[in-house]
Amino acid sequence: MPKNGGCEVYMAPFAVIIQNDIKNYVEPDICIICDKDKLSDRGCEGAPDWIIEIVSPSSRKTDYIIKNAAYSRAGVREYWIVDPAKACTTVYDYDKDAAPTIIPFDQPVQCGIFPDLSITVSDYLK
């Protein structure tokens, strides 16, 4: 993975084509892409390194079940589900192939793919 700022952050609306079909794309709330070769005029063609979804009542099933499975299959390295209703962040570290970790908003969430980065979600809700 590139060091010294080689990754870029994209926010919705931004198409992520995780299958070889432009008709089947997702628009994550936030995605971090470290491989510039995946970027095109259509969006990101392939799996971003890290995706963050903010759950809403209408997206709960999609974020926790449908997108989780799709992101895992596509090769996303890390997936965070930020859930305001539950005041927690669920972290899937697909690189480690481990069970998800659930962290309350008032505790720091350690990023798996960027070891020097941790985020306390409650700091951004004030």
Stretch-by-stretch model annotation:
Residues 1-4:
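Short helix-capping segments at alpha-helix termini
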Residues 7-74, 81-126:
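C-terminal interaction segment
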